[in-house]
Amino acid sequence: VRTDLGALFGSIDVYLFDQLLRGRIVPGMRVLDAGCGRGRNLAFLLREGYEVRALDPDPVAVEAARALARRLAPAIPESSFRRETVEDSTFPDACADVVISNAVLHFAPDEAIFLAMLRGTWRLLSPGGLLFCRLASSIGIEGLVRPLGGRRFSLPDGTDRFLVDEAYLVDLTAELGGRLLDPIKTTVVQGQRAMTTWVVRREG
């Protein structure tokens, strides 16, 4: 029997897929995508009956994610998909066992907003829950980025991003009261940009 993996998993981030393969995200968990876009990471979760919530400030993206849910998991209420920013989210505290933040935090214009976004993300996570973050970093391309001030950098690919590094993420993990589940891993894309995977368990 041939399985259409694309139809089954959608365009899920490969590092998020790794968390599924390792049994860290299992049916029955409440999953919130904090910056869902059009729902690229949600197709499998919706199809498999996870309790999914999602937010994004882009109304077109949120409507696309709602449409995906209507098709794959019609029992999920439309109110589970909200047009809002994570720092001002109306979802209740500790409402998710897994919070996904995939390519979101590096769009912060300064450190104050980055920290507000991160705290807003963390607030949604229940004790013992898993935070999955993918975000831009300077790791491995330190000599190729141009500082703009306040942890904002110009990258070789022509974009400007808020960049973290390993020491900053380690410090943030401790400040949040979390524990690294995996070593901090970074993919350098041909000297143009670096994307770091940061997976944290919320203690307590």
Functional labels for PLM-detected ranges:
Residues 87-99:
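A short acidic, Gly/Pro-enriched loop at the edge of an enzyme's catalytic core
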Residues 105, 117, 137:
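Flexible, active-site-proximal loop/turn residues at the rims of small-molecule/cofactor binding pockets
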Residues 59, 111-115:
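Non-membrane alpha-helical structural segments and their capping/turn regions in soluble enzymes
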Residues 115-127:
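A short glycine-rich, Lys/Arg-flanked "PGG" loop and its adjoining helix->strand segment in the class I
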Residues 1-26, 32, 37-88, 132-204:
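Class I (Rossmann-like) S-adenosyl-L-methionine-dependent methyltransferase catalytic domain
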Residues 98-112:
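A short SAM/SAH-binding and catalytic strip from SAM-dependent methyltransferases
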